[in-house]
C-alpha cells in the first residue's frame, strides 16, 4: 500500500530557531515559509529531501491538535505521511479494519493532495496520514 514517504511533519516550539538550525547544521533553507490562520493557526517551513517533504510547524495558539500534541509530548515528529495511489480505497479499507478517521470524508489539503487521517486512538497511539498526491506519478502496484 505505501509507495513512498510523502512527508514528515515535525512540531516545534520556535520555528525561527529551527529554520536557523536547519541552515547551520544541514545547509538547507526552506522552500517556503507559510502562516495559516483559522482554527489551527500555525507557522510552517517546508523543505524537500528528494520527493519527500519535511514540514516543520510552530502552532500559533494553544488549542489546535498540533499545540496540544506539542504540550503533551514536546517537540518532535507529529506524524509521518505515506504516499498511496487510492485515498478513497485506503480509507474504506482502514474503516473496514476497525479504524476511526479524523474526518468522515477524504479531505483535500491546501496544496491539493487528498488526505486520509487515521485516528491515533484506533492505531495504537500512532498518527497515520495517507496521501494521494496528483503531482507525484506512481504505478498503482
Where are these regions (language model features)?
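Vicinal oxygen chelate
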Residues: 1, 5-13, 45-50, 55, 67-89, 91-141, ...
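N-terminal beta-strand motif that seeds the catalytic metal site of vicinal oxygen chelate
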Residues: 1-19, 25, 75-82, 131-141
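Amphipathic alpha-helical segments
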Residues: 14-30, 92-97
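N-terminal strand-loop-strand beta-hairpin
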Residues: 27-49, 53, 117-119
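A short, acidic/glycine-rich surface segment
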Residues: 31-33, 63-68
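Short, conserved turn/kink motifs that form compact alpha/beta structural patches or helix kinks used as
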Residues: 59-61
Amino acid at each position: 500500500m505505501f509507495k513512498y514517504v510523502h512527508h514528515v511533519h515535525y512540531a516545534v516550539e520556535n520555528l525561527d530557531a529551527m529554520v536557523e538550525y536547519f541552515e547551520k547544521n544541514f545547509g538547507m533553507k526552506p522552500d517556503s515559509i507559510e502562516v495559516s490562520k483559522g482554527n489551527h493557526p500555525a507557522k510552517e517551513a517546508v523543505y524537500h529531501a528528494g520527493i519527500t517533504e519535511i514540514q516543520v510547524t510552530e502552532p500559533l495558539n494553544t488549542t489546535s491538535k498540533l499545540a496540544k500534541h506539542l504540550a503533551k509530548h514536546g517537540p518532535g515528529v507529529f506524524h509521518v505521511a505515506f504516499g498511496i495511489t487510492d485515498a478513497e480505497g485506503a480509507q474504506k479499507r482502514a474503516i473496514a479494519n476497525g479504524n476511526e478517521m479524523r474526518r468522515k470524508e477524504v479531505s483535500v489539503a491546501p496544496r491539493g493532495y487528498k488526505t486520509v487521517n487515521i485516528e491515533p486512538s484506533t492505531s495504537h497511539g500512532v498518527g497515520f496520514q495517507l496521501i494521494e498526491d496528483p503531482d507525484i506519478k506512481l504505478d498503482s502496484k
